[in-house]
């Protein structure tokens, strides 16, 4: 009864869908050309070989971390799911060049909200790869993860993973 009175009884949804944060070609995690991601050292997920330079939020939640080098964003859902959107490979070395971050740490976001714009051609020419990993960094806290085998994905529209948190 007190929970209802004071609003602390909010039921957190354990199930969450992760949508494509980029438009492009779906890449299985094992096929990402970087062993840290391909061997799932950072967690389960997938990659996208983008065809355009805009990243949108793949989940509803909040921005947990904007990397100072602008190449990656950490997101957190209400149910505890933590997601890393990493734009390209070895892009940390670009030191923010070619990236424009549109959100700040602590911002609330919904699926499809723009997070980052980037110069696809610049990254293609100056980084190891434009293939962008999307990783569940707290995979160990998930009860189940169902990854759909897609081909082409559309940012904010194509559902790629269903996760149930513990």
From Swiss-Prot:
Q: Where is this site: Important for phospho-donor activity?
A: 71
Q: Where is the active site?
A: 86 (tele-phosphohistidine intermediate)
Keyword flag Transferase: yes
Which PROSITE patterns did the record assign?
PTS_EIIA_TYPE_1 (PS51093), PTS_EIIA_TYPE_1_HIS (PS00371)
Q: Which UniProt keywords apply?
A: Cytoplasm, Kinase, Metal-binding, Phosphoprotein, Phosphotransferase system, Sugar transport, Transferase, Transport, Zinc
Q: How does it assemble?
A: Heterodimer with glycerol kinase (glpk).
What is stated about domains? The EIIA domain is phosphorylated by phospho-HPr on a histidyl residue. Then, it transfers the phosphoryl group to the EIIB domain.
Protein name (database record): PTS system glucose-specific EIIA component
Organism, per UniProt? Staphylococcus aureus (strain MRSA252)
The primary gene name is: crr
């Amino acid at each position: 009864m007190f929970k209802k009175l004071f609003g602390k009884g909010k039921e957190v949804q354990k199930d969450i869908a992760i949508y494509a944060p980029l438009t492009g070609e779906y890449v299985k995690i094992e096929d990402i050309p970087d062993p840290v991601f391909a061997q799932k050292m950072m967690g389960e997920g997938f990659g996208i070989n983008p065809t355009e330079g805009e990243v949108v939020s793949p989940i509803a939640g909040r921005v947990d971390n904007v990397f100072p080098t602008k190449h990656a964003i950490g997101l957190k859902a209400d149910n505890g799911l933590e997601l890393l959107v990493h734009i390209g490979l070895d892009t940390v070395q670009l030191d923010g060049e070619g990236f424009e971050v549109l959100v700040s740490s602590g911002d609330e976001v919904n699926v499809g909200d723009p997070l980052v714009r980037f110069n696809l051609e610049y990254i293609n020419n100056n980084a190891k790869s434009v293939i962008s990993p999307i990783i569940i960094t707290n995979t160990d806290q998930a009860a189940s993860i169902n990854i759909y085998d897609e081909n082409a994905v559309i940012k904010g529209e194509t559902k790629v993973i269903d996760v149930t948190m513990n």
